[in-house]
Amino acid sequence: MTWLDQVLAEGEHAERMRSDLEHFARRALKLRPKAGMLEPFIFNAAQKKLHETIEAQRAKMGRVRVVILKARQLGISTYIAARLFHRTIYNPGLRTIIIGHEKRASSNLFQIVKRYYDNMDETIRPSIGISNAEELIFDKIDSGYIVTVATNEGTGRSATAQMLHASEVAFWTDLPSQMASLMQTVPDVDGTEIILETTANGFNDFQALWRKAEAGESEFMPVFLPWSIDPGYRREIDSDFEMDSDERALSHLYKLDAEQIAWRRAKISQLGSAERFPQEYPLVASEAFISSNFDSFISPDLVIKARREKVDPYGILIIGVDPAGSGDARTSIAWRRGRRIEKVESRRGLDTMQVCGWVRKIIREDKPVKVNIDVGGLPPNYCEAFALRFAAIAFPVSTAR
């Protein structure tokens, strides 16, 4: 190799280190895995999927806004730490904030970053100007980290950053107000990244945030990562291993093999509760929010069973209407035939007459036997408007509060 070839090769390597996170992680970063000892950071299946998803959003939108709902111990916080570390050391003037739900959690996340730094090759490691429990500043490039805890006193309000990692947001004490503060911390410009990640914590404010993301009603893209994506979540089986009926149904529905089912069975035994397992290790996003501590009218077991059951449509068509109260709220209509909801449609910004017109069109085209309208909390004139509109076509409409 000539000196010119060597210079070109070194230049290509440096550029790839800068532009390719997966290459950078494998070559420059060290992890301490569950078994101990440091080893190169090679993306696992969950990390690869998340990386591809985030990069696709960044290429399309110019910025990153994602909310991640995950099973436990998939290495997601480790990936996010690597991603933001890579951006921070290669972009002068960039600030990154790490926010955990409690002080110890924030400290643990910060230790991952410091381990990355301490074990890097000195030729690519930026010099440090400040290093303490709450800050890591790279002086010559004017980039660095701030570490804090989610509190009620305006999370991150006094800081300005371009990168933000918010961890275990389902366990934050006042998520709506804390999110309002955070959205002021990171400017709404290209090149910025806000990444929220968490395991579930029952029916709470995070569930509402997640549902909005799923419905496309927020700027955050939802990313769900089930436990089954991790090839390590398996257990060797004996020759006499047999699945029970529920396990066979799970295996068929989610394409799980016997070793995955065996791991699940052992983990349920460790947790001491089959109801707790889906919250810690969900297979679909919806079951993550089913908590054994939630005193619901319908038991979690029945909800999970219903979600897994395939029901063919049959019988008469009934329409359910949930009209918006006011403003830009959403009106939703469901088509039900027998025990199956065939579809749901939602529209925003409709007034009373527009909703009536929509329902009347459905009556004419789909010919339902009955329309049920939920008018709870709506003013009396709303109910009267429906009654007058549908009396003209002699159609039975039920309004229930």
Task: Tell me the role of every PLM-derived stretch.
Residues 1-65, 123, 340, 350-353:
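N-terminal accessory segments
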Residues 60-84:
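Walker A/P-loop
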Residues 94-115:
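Conserved Walker A/P-loop ATP-binding site and its immediately adjacent core
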Residues 108-162:
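Inter-Walker segment of RecA-like/P-loop motor cores
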Residues 162-174:
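SF2 helicase catalytic motif II
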Residues 171-256, 380-391:
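ASCE P-loop NTPase helicase motor core
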Residues 201-216, 237, 337-401:
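Mg2+-dependent endonuclease catalytic cores in nucleic-acid-processing enzymes, primarily RNase H-like
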Residues 231-321:
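ATPase catalytic-site recognition across NTP-hydrolyzing enzymes
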